[in-house]
Amino acid sequence: PTRAEISDVANAVYDGTSAIMLSGETAAGKYPVKAVEVMAKIAERTEQSIHYDKRFRNFDFQIRNEIDAISHATCGMAIDIKAKGIAVCTLSGMTARMISRFRSPVDIVGLTTNEKTWRKLALSWGVTPIMVEEFDSTEVLFYTAKKTAKEVLGLEKDDRIVITGGYTNGTSGNTNLIKVERI
């Protein structure tokens, strides 16, 4: 990549973009694999220099609706209690994407039963999408979220996670709960 492309990648990451890709010329050039490796290294180093917890606290987010409020509260709670993860149970992916937009420094696991949602979440900043079976109760939702977050994030005994989602018998857009769980 050229210096300009390196600068563009770093600035895109700093500005909070969820995904980056090579330009056509670079991708079709002589060294596309090396270009991707360099781009990934630039992105990783740039992310390491960002203090996401300070950015979250200092930014004046506009809270327009309930899902914004729950997503913002989930991020704030995770930071405040030093949670090791956020588990989002989502049918449409909306709640996971809303949490992602706040750029929480806490890892996010997006649990979904919908393959289309799983694919979309793969492009959401900080979200690791996981396919799960449908929940038939909030107890199963909490158990699955806790178990999956432990496996995916490598959590240990006494680590805390924040779980959010909704139990609405298969309809999307009804996020209505936040819970803190200890592993």
Per-range role (PLM):
Residues 12, 99, 161:
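Conserved, mostly hydrophobic/aromatic
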Residues 9-32:
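Glycine-rich phosphate-binding active-site loops on the catalytic face of alpha/beta enzymes
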Residues 23-24, 29, 48-58, 84, ...:
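Flexible, glycine/charged-enriched surface loops at secondary-structure junctions
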Residues 95-97, 103-140:
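Nucleotide-binding motor/catalytic cores of P-loop/tubulin-like NTPases across gene-expression machines
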Residues 69-83, 143-153, 159:
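Phosphate-interacting basic helix/loop segments used at nucleotide- and nucleic-acid interfaces
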